[in-house]
Amino acid sequence: MKQIPLFITVLALFAAPLSGAFIGADFGQAQAQKAKREKPKKPKTRRSEVLGKAAFQRIEQSQTWLGEEKYLEAFAPLQAILESERFSAYEKAVAIQTMGFIHAAQGDYAKTIASFERALATGHLPVRVVSDITYNLAQLYLAQGQGQKSLALLDQWFAALEGEPSAAPYALRAQIYLGMDNLAAAEKDIRLAIAKAEAPKQQWTRILLSVLLQQARYKEARPILEDAVERWPGVKTFWQQLTAVYYDADDEKLAFVAQQAMHIQGMLSSSKELSSMAQLYLYHDVPIKAAQVLQSGMDAGKIEKTEKNYELLAQSYRHAREWKASIAPLTQAAKKSDKGKFYEQLAQSHLQDEQWAKAEAALEKALEKGKLEKPADTWLLLGIARVRTEKYDAAIKAFRKAGDDDDTARDAFRWIRSIERRLAEERDAKSDG
């Protein structure tokens, strides 16, 4: 159940500015309260205009129903005040204002604005309440995307204010200026707000960073972002912005550290984010970590099982010299691809594990699929695999294919001569026997 403060009393009607929870803005009730002058002078209220007992009871009943979220019931006693001639203009103004708070609780900001403006138009509200409603209206119009109107109301609020404003109104005006692309004015106000605040606020830091980053003032943004990730380590946006700033300064190591921090905190969840993180681990010579990111991501269904991702996983295992582990992703990549390169890589993993027959089969499939960058190299490997399985005639055929290419001819014919010598020695041994 929502707890709505009784902002109407018999003694005075000094409503706090509408909370961010109501208007959908980033400036909540606590900020709005700080917007009031720190040492307010006595408001120029009309002492004769106070709520009578009947009006007070009806408004109090409306507040009770509002707290219970019984909105239709909450309107009834207020409407009764408006329709009766027994109530004063002041009491009717209070009823209209209260209707605005009910509309706000319902999320109907257009009607909230209409009620507040209608209440102001009566001319019967205390000066302090007029100030608060004006501030609320500035927030509401901003939430509705009407920056110009919001700015006009806030400037009106500043002009009527007695004393020194606190930080929040400057931050609100900075947000308005930012939405209007008036970056210079936004920066001036947000720096004033931050200077007045006891501690930096996340939303205000966001506004200042937006001003700086839009102007490519990355050097100025860097210390602010470094402070932000320490204060609010769970905010992904700050880490992303800091990473970009590090890259702009060609500080790849710190950018990598920032991205690791996001990964460790579980901020990377999409297939693209996780596969990119794996590529970074691979780039920074941590291949086994790259493989772990990809393998766990695929197993959990977070990383898409595409040809490209299987290739990256296999590459990570191969760089880590985990030949056996690379076989499964290479097999999957080979099935998905229309090129023979993955079967060739699969064969290389089998060769490292001395699985000659499996290597031979994979190389034959690689040549069958084709589209190889250097088929002569594949023929050479196939010849070697066949030698290891003592298929000498088939090996010679493969080496002759490899010999058609100048780059592999020397090695190919050296293998052929080696096979011929071995076969000759075997024949001699048999004849001697």
Over which residues does each language-model region extend?
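Solenoid-like repeat scaffolds
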Residues: K44-V50, L82-S88, L120-P126, Q156-G163, ...
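N-terminal leader/linker segments that initiate helical-solenoid repeat arrays
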Residues: K2, G20-E117, H124, V129-D132, ...
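Generic helix N-cap/helix-start motif at coil->alpha-helix transitions
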Residues: L51-E60, A89-I96, P126-N136, E162-L172, ...
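Alpha-helical adaptor scaffolds
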Residues: E307-R321, I327-A376
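Residue-level recognition of tetratricopeptide repeat
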Residues: Q63, F101, Q139, Q175, ...
